[in-house]
Amino acid sequence: MDGADGTDLANGTDGRGGGLRAHIGSFTSGGGRGITSAAVDPATGALTLLSATDAVADPSYLTLDRDTGVLYAVSETEQGAAAAFRPTPEGLTALGPAVRVGGSGPTHLGVAGRRLLTANYTSGSVSSLPLAADGSFSGPASVLAHEGSGPDESRQERPHAHQVLPDPSGRWVLSVDLGTDSVRVCAPDPATGALRLHGETVLRAGTGPRHLAFHPGGEVVYVLHELEPQLTVCRWNAGSGQLEPIDEVPVASAAVSGAVRAYPSAVVPSPDGRFVWAAVRGADAIATLSLADGAERPRLVGSVDCGGSWPRDLAVDPSGRRLYAANERSGDVTWFDVDPLTGQPRRAGSVAVPAATCVVFV
């Protein structure tokens, strides 16, 4: 296992210097190295591995606070924890020990002001942790428990919060619950930062919503479902905190859906708002949806192989020209050049990262 101080992976290259970095989460329980740091070639998008840290177990999801430059990771374990890191040219430096989040099996996290939010899948709750000015943890978590269940007795026997993130306005926090087929809208308490339920949007029963993304315009939300290969398109009103479903769009063709059991995992829009991509496990594919002529409802226009097995997450590089897939079961990160006219990804390369789960650019 690589050392907590950042084991060198670059065959004698120390990784010093500027430029874009990618940080890759993984399941240490599945053979992963923890968080792997890589340099990104600006011309080709190729990743060169620099170092890895196993300072936290099962860092399956990462997020960057762009105000402080601090990188946060969940520890997707029964105890449930989060950790904070300061990126360096060589890799990552931990900002103190990991802290408990007050829930079990956190799968996602986001930053809202001076609070870190986590979605706790196993316990079906969302947590809010206070942060100091330097991005370190400054107090215990407050926890908001979800309630309810769904028709799938094997996956929806109780709440399973899978994602939590602030809306673009910063006024609201949205949490996606696979177990209750719903998206909850919360408002942080002005005095304590604790989350208070504002409203709940119930989606089609049994579809298991997993992950959502905002269109760059901020008024449309795409909710990806895990238990059916569908994307729900919603209108978002930041003034009232209301989420309104308006359409469902497939992310896999009927032929693909009939041949394999598809488990969609992640959805990301292009920075220019013209395309939406969805990772589909089982089919091991990346679906491309087009928003031609400014339409708010995308349509499926194609699908490509993800370059590995079980794509758990997708990330678009800051230029918007490349797409990266974290393929958990094949243990690699594959990158694609994006056709600017069609949005279709074309495989350009890959690098081995055991049990890869997430990619974040710094």
Feature map (PLM): residue ranges:
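Beta-rich catalytic cores
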Residues: 31, 58-60, 105, 160, ...
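Conserved beta-strand positions in repeat-built beta-propeller and related beta-rich domains
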Residues: 24-29, 73-77, 118-121, 167-168, ...
